[in-house]
Amino acid sequence: MFDYFRKEIEWAGRPLILETGKVARQADGAVMITYGDTVVLCTAVGAKSVKPGQDFFPLTVNYQEKAYAAGKIPGGFFKREGRPSEAEVLNARLIDRPIRPLFPENFRNEVQITATVLSYDNENDPALVSLIGCSAALTLSGIPFFGPVACARIGRIDGKLVVNPTHDEIKDSTLDLMVAGTAEGVLMVESEASELSEETMLEAVTLGHTSFQPVIDAIIALAEHAAKAPWDLPSLTKEEIALRKRVEKVGNKLMADAYKERQKQARYKKVAEAKDRINEILADEGLDVELAKPMLKELEAQVVRGSILKTGIRIDGRDLKTVRPILAEVGILPRAHGSSLFTRGETQALVVATLGTGQDEQIIDALEGEYRSNFMLHYNFPPYSVGECGRMGSPGRREIGHGKLAWRAIHPLLPSKEAFPYTMRVVSEITESNGSSSMATVCGSSLALMDAGVPLPRPVAGIAMGLIKEDRGYAVLSDILGDEDHLGDMDFKVAGTADGVTALQMDIKITSITPEIMKIALEQAREGRIHILGEMAKALTEGRGEVSGNAPKITTISVPKEKIRDVIGSGGKVIREIVEYSGAKVDIGDDGTVTIAASNDEQAQKAIARIEGIVAEPEIGRIYEGKVVKTADFGAFVNFLGPRDGLVHISELAEGRVAKTSDVVKQGDAVKVKVIGFDDRGKVKLSMRVVDQATGADITESVGAKPGRPPRRDAE
């Protein structure tokens, strides 16, 4: 019934199993991949024809985590999986990026790749497993694909690089790096690091590339038994070949002249005019203008790339290493907790930092369980930033990806919760863009956080590198423009401090690059980063001495764990009363840490005093404020120190004989009491008689320690 094939290898100490022919047999390619007890179903399907007029390659990657994979039932009203989470979007991008450049340049059929996590063992990263599985599914499908691709995750634990660390091991790692590529070279890198050197980062990339070679061999071995016949690729017709030559001849000078304009918007206008003029000439000659559209894009790339390689001068007139002019400003928004405006050439980010309390932490429900994050970084890219009309609304995949990259760059420098008990949210509004907006976000975020008073040990900066690579040579570009990104072969983003790298993301648009090019790019990026940090230092060099006056003032105290329930009270009654009484926000953790957020010191001290009163043990001889909760013939019960009650015997209500308790106090009265002892059952004995109810002063000496007995006076 099944035409079943299986390939198993031992990889990084665990079995990796690739299976095909049993599940999802109607997909062009389907692989069930197992690593440890993590299981992912990966499929690849391609449309058999191209949609008329389509001049791009429509590749879609869907990554989905099923709750049942971790033995869970989804939350929410509908109890089923909904829209992709941020983690799912990021993992889909992780799969897309190394796969996309390996399809033929003239391939236009729609391709859909799906990775469904069916089982998760809390050890082996499902994103890594999914990327390998999707590569295998494509390799088997017959769809034109210059793979296979594989990947590895590299950690650095106790100073040693580790291949595919488990979920628990990565928590103690100073590096979390994912590297993907073919047998020939690296295609993608994504990492977060604790200020590591460029040499260490390159060593990790090299180790990753070496470590996944057995996986590529396993995919090839599976394909030898189970791959479908490859699709035929349409070759260029004689008409298309002739048209391409004519486009190059007619358009070369027109396009080169247009790209002499240095300013972005003016250049775009001249390029559009050049394309219109080329189309006019082609139309006058009776040639197919629609067919020439992709050829015009190719011509544009040839002109720009050829000029840079030949002259060493870039689109905006810079040489290969020069960074665009930078202006950094801080404190530009009066009511924000921290703000910055970072401008680099025609790229600009308005970044705002907001400080909150533990109640503002983001709750994330992931396969590995629910956890909280006290740092959020959100990146917004409105269409006006590039002078266009477009969609506004919820963030797209690109915005989520750029925000996460900036998050990785800043995260290693953040203080611990114990040292800085605030929740931090940073929002980057890209107000202008001409390349490297994610790296502008890194620079602006660092400045905004320091402006808010977050004690970053060192500022963080980022730079985007590019590559032009042809048979006759290559050029590594610092601080690339948008056009250099689109028309180049590499987008290599490096962020870090003066001491080392904190984040690295590399995407290659050609089949691979050499370690030599990576080394040059990393060194050039370091030079650029140091320059940018110097420009940022003109605005701010370190966090302000205290948090913004607009931010809440947070104080932390600790209470014994056994007293937590007393502070919270039944149904949260006590903690709500503390909040109402003080005006401060109060949050208590499972370990007894109480976080108090207030707009001024008075509110904080009122909350602290009330909490300390609740958790304190009554001391004999000490005076407390309380409330009468019940009266009886023999006295009154007074609530004090939070939930604690004590008895004021009728003889201790007031000086002299008291006929009825209600003659002195009624339920609900606020009173001042002194602890005079404990009975044989440990109950607290209180006295109002020895306390001045107006001032709270102890008047034992004047009224006597016991009722009816005036104090003994020494004879004169």
Swiss-Prot record:
Residues 621-689 form the S1 motif domain. Mg(2+) binds at D485, D491. GO terms for molecular function: 3'-5'-RNA exonuclease activity; magnesium ion binding; polyribonucleotide nucleotidyltransferase activity; RNA binding. PROSITE patterns: KH_TYPE_1, S1. Residues 552-611 form the KH domain. NCBIfam families: polynuc_phos, PRK11824.1. Involved in mRNA degradation. Catalyzes the phosphorolysis of single-stranded polyribonucleotides processively in the 3'- to 5'-direction. This is Polyribonucleotide nucleotidyltransferase. The gene is pnp.
